[in-house]
Each structure stands twice: as C-alpha cells, then as structure tokens.
From Swiss-Prot:
Protein function: Catalyzes the formation of 4-diphosphocytidyl-2-C-methyl-D-erythritol from CTP and 2-C-methyl-D-erythritol 4-phosphate (MEP).
Pfam families: IspD
Protein name per Swiss-Prot or TrEMBL: 2-C-methyl-D-erythritol 4-phosphate cytidylyltransferase
Reactions that this protein is recorded to catalyse: 2-C-methyl-D-erythritol 4-phosphate + CTP + H(+) = 4-CDP-2-C-methyl-D-erythritol + diphosphate
E.C. number: 2.7.7.60
UniProt-listed InterPro entries: IspD, IspD/TarI, IspD/TarI_cytidylyltransf_bact, ISPD_synthase_CS, Nucleotide-diphossugar_trans
Gene, per the UniProt record: ispD
Assembly and binders: Homodimer.
Record site: Transition state stabilizer: 21, 28
Keywords: Isoprene biosynthesis, Nucleotidyltransferase, Transferase
GO molecular function (one): 2-C-methyl-D-erythritol 4-phosphate cytidylyltransferase activity
Single GO BP term: isopentenyl diphosphate biosynthetic process, methylerythritol 4-phosphate pathway
Length: 235
C-alpha cells in the first residue's frame, strides 16, 4: 500500500475568552506556566509540526495581551478578531484560511498536548474524507439530574461514551459548510465535531490522553504545571 503524505494544515486557536470562570481580570490564556503563557504552550505544540504552515489566532476585540508575546511575530501566525461564541470565533478563523485542505482547531488553554497524540491524529485522519478528534473514553460514573434540581434522575450508560478533547482536525471546506449551516440555523455547537454531526457527517475518534486538560479554573493551573513539567522532561 502506498503511504499517503500528511497534507499541509492550517491551525486555528479560538482565544477570544475573557476569563470569567477563572475569576480573573486576565484572560486565562495569558496565565503563565514557567516562562510561557498557556496560549504559547498550546501554539508551540502545533507549530513544531512541519505540516502546519499557518496558525490563525482568534482573539477578543479588546485583547491587548497577545501582541505583547514574541510568538505573535512568527511569520506563520495571523491574528483575527473573534465573535461572541466559540463557533463564531472558529468561523472568523476559517474566513482567513488560504489554500489549505485541512484545518486543525485547538483550544488556546489546552497546553499539555503530546507530540505522539498529534501525530496519531494526523496519521489516522489523513485517510478520512471528513476528519477526526482526540478523545478519551469516559470511565467515571455519570449521573443525570432532574432539570433545575440536584436530585439524581438516573445513571447514564457509559458504553461508547467519549470525552471530546482538542485538537480536532477536519476537511476545510466541509467544516466551513457545516459550521456556517449550524450558525445560520442557530444550532448550539460546543465543538467543531458537533457541527459535523449536525450535518450528518461521521468523524473519527482517536484515543487521546487524560492529561490533555483544558485549563478552566484556578486549580487547573497547578495540574497543568505538573503535567507540563513531566512532558518537557520526556522531550
């Protein structure tokens, strides 16, 4: 069988969040671990791959932090202004993609991405016409409560349930079409894969790692610091 080459890819990092859940005046993507911000760690994990030739960072209109970072001057990096939701911001990024068949979307506050996981995502997804995502099987017991209460209604069957992560890698034209349709119809999409699902397309799930965490609350910073220290020792 002939090997199929990994195509050139454009990366999009939605980074228009304002840090409300962190209860901080500083948006969480600019919190630091070591000598780098979370967004720099996340971008570096992507930009070290030769197949990623362009990285579009989508920021808030009032963001004055990103351009203070040295990585913002990397010739591969472009900056655009995002919207009110993640989907709006990703769509804003898609409008600035140039001549790329594939687009990879990664959370700006998910700094602990392993090189091996990224390569596995590339290797498996390149044979797909749609795309795929990193995810991990749900291992904890999941409870559903009655609406508006904290009373347990039932236990959710964990079989075939996965916790979606990023990066998520998709065919550019297909992602743009599906996201545009979802936004037009005011469908809530919490990640890129859900836009594809809405339009009836089947994405691939690629087994990721539980340490690929999204930093949402203050306590997550300590955990990310621990995971990153282990990751850098390994490399």
């Amino acid at each position: 069988m002939l090997k199929k080459k990994i195509p050139y890819i454009t990366a999009i990092l939605p980074a228009a969040g304002t840090g409300k859940r962190m209860k901080s005046l500083l948006p969480k993507q600019y919190c630091t671990i070591g000598d780098k911000t979370l967004i720099e760690h996340s971008m570096n994990a992507l930009l070290c791959q030769s197949c990623i030739r362009h990285c579009i960072v989508v920021i808030n209109a009032r963001d004055h932090w990103f351009r203070q970072l040295s990585i913002s001057y990397d010739p591969r990096v472009s900056v655009v202004v995002g919207g009110h939701t993640r989907a709006d911001s990703v769509m804003a990024g898609l409008q600035h993609v140039k001549k790329s068949v594939w687009v990879i979307v990664h959370d700006a506050v998910r700094p602990c991405l392993h090189h091996e996981d990224l390569l596995r995502l590339f290797e498996i997804t390149k044979f797909s016409q749609v795309g795929g995502i990193l995810a991990i099987p749900i291992c904890n017991t999941i409870k559903r409560t009655y609406c508006g209460t904290n009373f347990i209604r039932y236990t959710v069957n964990r079989e075939n349930l996965w916790h979606a992560l990023t990066p998520q890698l998709f065919n550019y034209d297909l992602l743009k079409y599906c996201l545009k349709k979802a936004l037009k119809n005011r469908v809530t999409v919490t990640d890129e894969a859900s836009a594809l699902e809405y339009c009836g397309y089947k994405s691939i799930v690629i087994h990721g790692r539980s340490d690929n965490i999204k930093v949402t609350h203050q306590n997550d910073l300590k955990l990310a610091n621990f995971y990153l220290s282990k990751l850098y020792k390994k490399t």
